[in-house]
A protein has these predicted regions:
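ATP-dependent carboxylate/acyl-activation modules
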Residues: 9, 33-352
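Short acidic-hydrophobic, aromatic-tinged amphipathic segments that line or gate anion-handling sites
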Residues: 1-2, 194
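Internal, active-site/partner-interface "lid" segment
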Residues: 3-47
């Protein structure tokens, strides 16, 4: 059992055999080792299995689904939230709720609101309070927000509850709620009201594929002004820098290809899930309505100057993008020609 006994046992065997006392000592160690192994097996089998709950159905009614509650404190999210009212959470509710909390986790200081639809943000807002933050998030795309998930990072107030009460949402999740806000929500029986004091994203994300699975680290990238490189003649103003960094936090959580348009530290429009960056840009500008003077954030580089030329038509003031295209020179030249300031982040923000 123990390497420390090898020499003494070998010497004893060479000298004529083991004494009864030595055999007893070795037997005691051997049985003790076996007992320890059995105890380890017992403890492993006695551990509580992860909490498993069946859901009404999956992404679609014809699909079965379930949720497994993870071990705390490795991660904290919708499965650990307290549900105050409403129907049981659906598969899509869990996905959208987590997407909202992931994006919301980017904003630690200012009151913030994120509205998610189909696992991608359709509105993000900051404000002096959560009511103002919600209004700004809703104004990004009030049409898409209908039937979405609302997440805020501060206590839900009566003022905010009155605003939410006027629109159909699936979920409202907040760290806590005023008693008055819960009373207002109680009239909306189908609204799921969740409280979660802290959100902790898992360190790794895992996706199953045919024949195996994929795993990767979570995207903990935190873009700061010092990381930016400005290759254009025109530089971003302080306001454009802060607006661009805000837009980058949003584009990071938007399905690729993604374009976010912002101005004066407010998100104006979000376009995601497009297979063409040109189309993503076009949709973002159509939703922005008046994009003149705005800052554009792109989750990946522009492979051609066509998107820049489209932005010039809309009088875009500045761009923040990863850079790294073999045609970066042409893109920079187009920006200089159209007097657009541009900053490179040095890394992209794909999300699939």
């Amino acid at each position: 059992v123990s390497p420390k006994d090898y020499r003494s046992v070998g010497t004893a065997i060479s000298g004529g055999g083991l004494t009864e006392k030595k055999r007893f000592s070795l037997a005691k160690k051997a049985f003790g080792h076996c007992a320890e192994y059995d105890q380890t097996i017992f403890e492993a089998l006695s551990k509580k299995a992860p909490e498993h709950s069946s859901l009404r159905y999956g992404e679609n009614p014809h699909q079965q689904a379930f949720v497994v509650k993870g071990d705390v404190p490795s991660s904290l999210g919708i499965p650990q939230s307290k549900q105050h009212q409403g129907k049981a959470l659906s598969y899509n509710n869990y996905l959208d709720g987590d997407a909202a909390l992931q994006c919301l986790s980017e904003f630690k200081k200012s009151p913030a609101c994120v509205i998610v639809k189909h696992n991608s943000p359709c509105g993000v807002g900051l404000g002096k309070n959560v009511s103002e933050a919600f209004t700004r998030a809703l104004n990004v795309d009030s049409l898409s927000a209908f039937g979405g998930v609302v997440a805020i990072n501060k206590k839900c107030t009566v003022d905010l509850a009155k605003k939410i009460d006027k629109i159909f949402f699936e979920i409202i999740v907040a760290p806590s709620f005023d008693a008055g806000s819960l009373k207002i929500f109680s009239k909306k029986k189908n609204l799921r009201v969740l409280s979660l004091k802290e959100y902790l994203s898992p360190e790794f994300s895992i996706k199953t594929i045919g024949g195996g699975s994929l795993g990767q680290e979570r995207d903990d990238s935190n873009l700061l002004e010092k990381h930016l490189v400005t290759p254009t003649k025109k530089k971003l103003t302080p306001n454009q820098l802060s607006t661009g960094l805000f837009a980058w936090k949003v584009v990071k959580h938007t399905k690729s290809n993604a374009i976010v348009v912002a101005k004066n530290n407010k998100i104006i429009s979000i376009s995601g899930g497009q297979t063409s960056r040109v189309d993503a840009t076009k949709i973002a500008f159509e939703k922005a309505k008046i994009p003149k003077g705005c800052v554009v954030a792109s989750d990946a580089f522009f492979p051609f100057k066509d998107s820049i030329e489209k932005m010039a038509q809309y009088k875009i003031a500045a761009i923040i993008q990863p850079g790294g295209s073999i045609r970066d020179g042409e893109v920079v030249e187009s920006c200089n020609k159209n007097k657009i300031a541009m900053a490179f982040t040095g890394f992209r923000a794909f999300k699939h």
